[in-house]
From Swiss-Prot:
Native species: Nitratidesulfovibrio vulgaris (strain ATCC 29579 / DSM 644 / CCUG 34227 / NCIMB 8303 / VKM B-1760 / Hildenborough)
GO biological process, alphabetically ordered: AMP salvage
Gene: adk
The name this protein goes by in its record: Adenylate kinase
Region called NMP, residue ranges: 30-59
E.C. no: 2.7.4.3
GO cellular component: cytoplasm
Described purpose of this protein according to its UniProt entry: Catalyzes the reversible transfer of the terminal phosphate group between ATP and AMP. Plays an important role in cellular energy homeostasis and in adenine nucleotide metabolism.
Pfam family membership, one: ADK
Location of the protein in the cell: Cytoplasm
Superkingdom of the organism of origin: Bacteria
Amino acid sequence: MNILIFGPNGSGKGTQGALVKKKYDLAHIESGAIFREHIGGGTELGKQAKAFIERGDLVPDDITIPMVLETLKSKGANGWLLDGFPRNMVQAQKLWDALQAEGMKLDYVIEILLPREVAKNRIMGRRLCKNDNNHPNNIFIDAIKPNGDVCRVCGGELSARSDDQDEGAIGKRHDIYYNTVDGTLAAAYFYKDLAAKGMTKYIELDGEGAIDAIKDKLLAQLS
């Protein structure tokens, strides 16, 4: 089973992706990790990408797409879930073409829907536990709201990451994601159009629900 997953920062995309990975024993591949592995490993593609990054330039698609494809082939023998790529419609088309050329199926595309303001509040509401960063605490989500100023799980001291409180940075990331013309949603909608033609399957999930409820709805649509 091969899956693409889309969702804005704050939508719970990472959480749902991890649950799907565990359920179906998929390789959970995140776009940033692809760059780090190729550059850190000194691959030819990694060297080319590094040269662009060091100049402060975007890495061209003719380098990025082969890097992504190579990782999917090497790590995704039992299936994969790709998170964080593609980020625009051009990349979506190129990735689709590359998958077709390799004879690789794209079984499902998942989009987690969440209003922009809700996504922003969720990011700004995240709190980190001093004892364990994996303890979920968010002042804007009732199910995981902390007990006052302490962790709901262990009572540990809480803090907020500085970048989670930077509304300007959050806004820039969301400007890219919610752009339906040449942003990430444009990429998602490219696959939605393919699904309408029966070429893949497109799953839309309401991201405002509880984690378990979203998971149950998602797993019910995967087969």
